[in-house]
Design a protein with these regions (language model features):
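Short, low-complexity, polar/charged sequence segments that are solvent-exposed and flexible
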Residues: 67-69, 148, 173-177
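Low-complexity, Gly/Ser/Thr/Pro-rich intrinsically disordered linker/tail segments
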Residues: 171-200
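General structural signal for secondary-structure boundaries
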Residues: 1-3, 15, 31, 105-107, ...
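Polar/charged alpha-helical tracts
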Residues: 16-25, 37, 120-123, 148-151, ...
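Intrinsically disordered, low-complexity segments enriched in small/polar residues
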Residues: 2, 7, 49-50, 103, ...
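N-terminal capping segments
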Residues: 1-87, 95-97, 200
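...with weaker cross-activation on analogous glycine-rich loops/strands in unrelated enzymes
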Residues: 91, 95-169
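Intrinsically disordered, low-complexity, compositionally biased regions/tails
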Residues: 8, 13, 55, 109, ...
């Protein structure tokens, strides 16, 4: 299966070929495709870790045993494989793909975004389980498009699975990052000036 969990509960990583096919079938801007490329690159590779955050790029400490120090979880004070929490994942994706911050925590990410309708959802937009403050623990996800049956796909870092691409039914709030143009294409970062010039 392209997404979800295996019969043993593990999440298989998405292969490069599957990732390229998924991106080719997305009808969205280059910036949004880059968000999806970064997000999907962690599927099955990074575990859930309460309070887990990371600088942009691959973190060599992921999957190594670490003490959970963030308060508020039954895993606090235990040793777990290091990874990301839900908001740490969405922040990592935006930072790695575009150099844009979403801030730490679901509440701050809610405040950095504005409401959109379900019909306005585009890959890279955020989904939340609930309005902050209405549930003890919230959850944030990245919209990834729809599957062949029209089900909404979300890529997110969930407890129990780590980073996964699936179709949870609990997403009730749809949001988009404030003051960031996600509709343009990426400007190549390492364009060689000589290659860009014209030959006579």
């Amino acid at each position: 299966t392209m997404y979800g969990t295996s019969s043993d509960g593990s999440v298989p990583p998405i292969s490069d070929a599957e990732l390229n096919l998924f991106l080719a079938n997305l009808d969205c801007s280059g910036k949004r495709k880059e968000l999806m490329r970064c997000a999907l690159s962690l599927v099955g590779r990074v575990p859930y870790f309460w309070g887990g955050k990371s600088a942009p790029g691959w973190n060599s400490e992921w999957n190594t045993p670490k003490l959970v120090t963030a308060a508020g979880s039954s895993s606090t004070g235990t040793i777990r494989p290091y990874g990301l929490d839900c908001s740490g994942f969405t922040e990592w994706v935006y930072q790695t793909a575009l150099g844009v911050t979403l801030y730490d925590g679901t509440w701050n990410q809610w405040d950095a975004t504005h409401a959109i309708t379900e019909e306005e959802l585009l890959p890279g937009d955020l989904g939340f389980m609930a309005v902050p403050g209405t549930v003890p623990v919230n959850h944030v996800l990245l919209y990834a498009g729809k599957d062949a049956d029209g089900n909404k796909l979300w890529v997110h870092c969930a407890s129990g699975t780590g980073v996964v691409l699936n179709s949870p039914d609990y997403v009730t709030q749809y949001r988009r990052r404030n003051d960031v143009d996600l509709e343009g294409d990426l400007v190549p970062a390492a364009l060689d000036v000589e290659e860009a010039g014209t030959s006579g």
